[in-house]
A protein has these predicted regions:
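Aromatic pocket-lining residues of Rossmann-like dinucleotide-binding sites
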Residues: 28
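Class I SAM-dependent methyltransferase SAM/SAH-binding core
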Residues: 23, 31, 35-66
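Conserved class I S-adenosyl-L-methionine
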Residues: 12-20
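Conserved alpha-helix/loop element of class I SAM-dependent methyltransferases that forms part
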Residues: 1-11
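Short amphipathic alpha-helix with an adjacent loop that forms part of the alpha/beta core around
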Residues: 66-75
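A conserved beta-strand element that flanks and buttresses the S-adenosyl-L-methionine
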Residues: 81
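Hydrophobic adenine-recognition pocket in adenosine-nucleotide-binding enzymes
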Residues: 85
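S-adenosyl-L-methionine-dependent methyltransferase catalytic module, highlighting the catalytic core
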Residues: 2, 23, 42-45, 63, ...
Length: 214
């Protein structure tokens, strides 16, 4: 997956929020031998599976847990993973600020976050629809919604600097002369740049943010 590919250097200690059944941790432990991987997962059934794959499992909600009560030390982890997690939290800002304390001075957070600026959502909203679904951009369990600008503000406002932000390639935009006019029927975007258009087609952003100690 894109998220696994973003981990290019072997971390010593990793903490994943919402680790599920431990698939990501299992893959990273195979990729990098000898790493310590701690997972937090609120679903007891998924956590039970993860126990056999990871070094330590905390069965709890990140917004309610006291991490020190589980023996986690400050400035301990090289990497914290939040894959499709932050949009499910009532206060992701507080969570990121808290997690910062558990990162080493040069530690990083990797996160994947849905893009609410996606053109399909905008068109549906124009037509009066904002229909929640079981999966996808309007997953019924999402409680926060982010554009790229808001993602950047969230990380910088909680003590991080973004070192990389990526997304899946957009082949639809390859053979267009920019700036361009793009006609979506009821919506016509005039004199739009490639960067502006890209933000409308991205489904999910992949962010690497480093603890800011300056």
């Amino acid at each position: 997956t894109e998220l696994l590919q973003m981990v290019t250097e072997a971390p010593q200690r990793v903490f994943e929020i919402g680790c599920g059944s431990g698939a990501t941790g299992h893959a990273l432990k195979q990729k990098f031998q000898g790493i310590e991987f701690v997972g937090l997962e609120p679903d007891a059934n998924a956590a039970r599976i993860a126990e056999s794959r990871l070094d330590k499992i905390i069965v709890s909600d990140i917004e309610k847990v006291h991490l020190e009560a589980y023996g986690l030390k400050k400035e301990y982890f090289d990497l914290i993973i939040c894959a499709d997690v932050l949009e499910h939290l009532y206060d992701p800002w507080k969570t990121l600020f808290t997690l910062r304390d558990y990162l080493k001075p040069d530690g990083k957070v990797i996160a994947s976050i849905p893009n609410t600026q996606n053109i399909n959502l905008i068109i549906n909203l124009l037509n009066g629809h904002w229909t929640y679904e079981k999966h996808g951009l309007l997953d019924a369990t999402h409680v926060r919604f982010f554009t790229l600008n808001e993602i950047e503000k969230m990380f910088t406002g909680t003590g991080y600097k973004i070192v990389r932000c990526s997304f899946a390639k957009q082949p639809k935009l390859e053979n267009i002369r920019w700036p361009a006019t793009i006609d979506f029927g009821k919506i016509v975007l005039k004199n739009i740049t490639r960067e502006e258009a890209t933000r409308l087609f991205v489904v999910q952003y992949f962010v690497i943010a480093q603890k800011n100690i300056s």
